[in-house]
Amino acid sequence: MFCEKAMELVRELHRAAEGRLPAFNEDGLRQVLEEMKALYEQNQSDVNEAKSSGRGDLIPTIKFRHCSLLRNQRCTVAYLYDRLLRIRALRWEYGSVLPSALRFHMSAEEMDWFNRYKKSLATYMRSLGGDEGLDITQDMKPPKSLYIEVRCLKDYGEFEVEDGTSVLLKKNSQHFLPRWKCEQLIRQGILEHVLS
């Protein structure tokens, strides 16, 4: 059946939970592109035959194949675009370093796009707020308090707070730190927010 493989790509993303990135389906995408190539070649052959011999009975078949080509194209673009939106959201959620499990699900082109997006965002943030720039990825929601209690999940080493004091982050140690300094480490899984 025409367009089934393309629809399966879209269904695959639809079934994935919000914020999750399923593995890049290179094989499915290749099958869709091969189907599109076959449809295009069949259409070209029928168009040439219809022109040369004046066969009007081929027109509905040509139109049907053309509609199938357009549907395959829309599904493919929707699949790739939705993946890029999810990858962009991952940059805001995890920061500039993605966990290896997420990188494993991305194609080489998607990793390249992520790196270019990351650099573009970093350049923009450096252009804001004076010498140090402004990190717009912090405080995605307004904080209720400026300091939070955190527990260290992994040995991290020394961590410098903005006033110059250093805190040693060892596994299972608890600290009271500025929220904006630890949000990145919370996203990376080094710290966890202790809710009292």
From Swiss-Prot:
Gene: GINS1
Role summary: Required for correct functioning of the GINS complex, a complex that plays an essential role in the initiation of DNA replication, and progression of DNA replication forks. GINS complex is a core component of CDC45-MCM-GINS (CMG) helicase, the molecular machine that unwinds template DNA during replication, and around which the replisome is built.
Primary location recorded for the protein, binned into one broad class: nucleus
Nucleus in keyword set: yes
Protein name in the entry: DNA replication complex GINS protein PSF1
Signal peptide limits: none
UniProt GO BP: DNA strand elongation involved in mitotic DNA replication
Protein family membership: Belongs to the GINS1/PSF1 family.
Domain of life (superkingdom): Eukaryota
Entry-linked InterPro entries: GINS_A, GINS_bundle-like_dom_sf, GINS_Psf1, PSF1_C
Keywords, sorted A to Z: Chromosome, DNA replication, Nucleus
GO cellular component: CMG complex; GINS complex
